[in-house]
Regions:
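FAD-binding core/adjacent interface of flavoenzyme oxidoreductases
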Residues: 67-144, 149, 242
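FAD-site-proximal beta/loop scaffold in flavoenzymes
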Residues: 116-142, 221-222, 235-307
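Beta1-alpha1 glycine-rich phosphate/pyrophosphate-binding loop at the start
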Residues: 1-69, 157-190
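Rossmann-like NAD(P)H-binding beta-loop-alpha module
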Residues: 130-177
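C-terminal, flexible cofactor-proximal segment of oxidoreductases
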Residues: 297-386
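A Rossmann-like FAD-binding core segment of flavoenzymes
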Residues: 70-77, 93, 167-262
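Short glycine-enriched, charge-decorated loop/helix-capping segments at active-site entrances
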Residues: 44-51, 115-120, 284-291, 349-353
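Catalytic nucleophile loop
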Residues: 9-12, 152-155, 294, 302
Length: 386
């Protein structure tokens, strides 16, 4: 009996750690990840302004697992029906039960020039590249323009970091920062009160917001947009262009994010968890792609894989075991906006120091849950100083 977890983001790490406890002793467990570290992705934007945070948000994979075998390789393809995985080395892995936790890639929608000229934020290296370019622009001493495409949480956080970086470098008055969003508001997938508070925090930092505005093209020095309602086009100068405008499935899934429902089961042998899938929960609600959702979905997925493995090892007689449904209850939402933050818990929205403290506690709580107490302490210090 072999269980395989593909990907070591929030979903993969959480699921594999739970399987270490839940799988029958006779089962083998493998986790496959291209990198040898686990990244606390929701903090990576901080490295644009605070490179010192890197140590706190990168965790060696080998330190996270007691039972699972860690394979450092890129997943090239997955046959979710047969349970065969092809790695970049040409080697194949077969599983009896597998979990697709490959996360998502940045989507470019075939927009001319966007992939070529738009910086993305998926890694510490990406954050370092954005920081280097921002400092180059600042160091010219000339007026300059920064454009961020996409005003979901990632775009909001990038715009906030760049505005605060420019302020810390004494250049904010000559650096224009524009945040573009195709839908009607910033943070469009979130509650209205949260959206309003985020917009206020952005406005306080003189970040110009263009909603109902789609990016149609990018060059080395400009971004072309079109207003969704009027059809009017505009060209914005862009000395730095960052693209956070959407997600697509991993290359191993041919860019697809398959739909899974309450039991998170894609096929008889394969489950899909986290950003790798479009999840519809037990209440019929679409689950947002987020760290919180990925971590929470990993628990029922692990329970279901373990139950099926135990049933099969016992002979597989009779009906399959009843699987645990996933029901997503959002505990709240938090986003940093430069040196500020916005948090919503229930109906209440808070900003300022309380929100910053909550932001720090979320990251630290996650690191502590994976036994990285020292890194959790480091992260709290970095967040509260940000």
């Amino acid at each position: 009996m072999h269980a395989v977890v593909l990907g070591a983001g929030y979903a993969g790490v959480t699921l594999a750690r739970k399987l270490e406890d839940a799988l029958p002793p006779a089962a083998d467990l493998t986790i496959v990840e291209e990198s040898d570290t686990h990244l606390v992705q929701h903090e990576v934007h901080r490295a644009i302004r605070r490179p010192s945070i890197t140590d706190a948000i990168e965790v060696p994979l080998e330190s996270l697992f007691d039972r699972a075998a860690v394979v450092t390789a890129r997943v090239e393809s997955v046959d979710s029906e047969t349970g065969e995985v092809t790695l970049d080395s040409g080697e194949t892995l077969d599983y009896d039960y597998g979990a697709l936790c490959l996360g998502a890639e940045t989507a470019f929608y075939d927009l001319p020039g966007v992939q070529e000229h738009g910086h993305t934020l998926k890694s510490v290296a990406d954050a370092e590249t954005i920081r280097e370019r921002a400092l180059e622009v600042i160091d010219t001493g000339e007026p300059a323009s920064v454009v961020v495409g996409g005003a979901g949480l990632s775009g909001v956080q990038v715009a906030g970091e760049l505005a605060t970086l420019a302020d810390e470098e004494g250049a904010r008055e000559r650096i224009d920062i524009t945040l573009l969003e195709q839908r009607d508001s910033v943070a469009p997938a979130f509650p209205e009160a949260f959206q309003d508070a985020v917009a206020d925090e952005l406005a306080e930092r003189d970040i110009e917001i263009h909603t109902q505005t789609a990016v149609t093209e990018a060059t080395a020095s400009a971004v072309t947009t079109q207003h969704e309602a009027t059809g009017d086009t505009d060209e914005l100068a862009a000395d730095l262009f960052v693209w956070t405008g959407g997600i697509a499935g991993a290359e191993a899934m041919a860019g697809d994010r398959p739909v899974v429902r309450r039991d998170l089961r894609l096929t008889e042998s394969t489950f899909a968890v986290g950003d790798a899938a479009r999840i519809v929960d037990a209440d019929g609600e679409a689950v947002p792609a987020s760290a919180s959702a990925a971590i929470r979905a990993a628990t029922p997925a692990a329970e279901n894989i373990a139950a099926l493995a135990e049933w099969e090892l016992a002979g597989g007689d009779g009906f399959e075991p009843e699987l645990t449904p996933f029901r997503f209850n959002a505990p709240g939402w938090i986003v940093s906006v430069g040196d500020g933050a916005v948090a919503q818990v229930g109906p209440e929205v808070v900003t300022g120091k309380p929100a910053k403290a909550m932001k720090a506690s979320v990251g630290a709580g996650y690191l502590s849950s994976i036994r990285e107490v020292r890194k959790a302490t480091e992260l709290v210090g970095e967040e509260l100083e940000a």
